[in-house]
Amino acid sequence: MDMLNENASLLTLTYHGSRQVIEGYNVMGVAKAALEASVRYLAENLGKDDMRVNAISAGPIKTLSAKGIKDFGSILTVVEEKAPLHQNVTTTQVGDVASFLLSNMSSCVTGQTIYADNGFSIMGI
């Protein structure tokens, strides 16, 4: 990959709907699951060139695309109630995780999906 610098770090965003059914998320869940698989395969393929590939699975955040998800406000409420830290994640928090993954501090991390969701993803029903 000639257009990437040596020691490059590639990063993408995904969502919990890739692993569990989220009502109304539908085909996006399938797309995000494929994206996460691509992260793992790219990490293996690019590792020989000392390039890292990771994903951040952020909790629900109020974005333009979130407006297309039916009852998005109720999803935010459920996360706030059930997540161990009892709050929704902010764009700043996700940015902080991204900064870590793009920095040399994470030089041994590749092929991973890092959950930045205040612990919501560890909770059962």
How would you label these PLM feature ranges?
Residues 47, 52, 109-111:
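Short, small/polar-rich loop/turn modules that mediate ligand/substrate recognition or access, typified
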Residues 83-94, 105:
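A conserved structural motif in NAD(P)-dependent oxidoreductases
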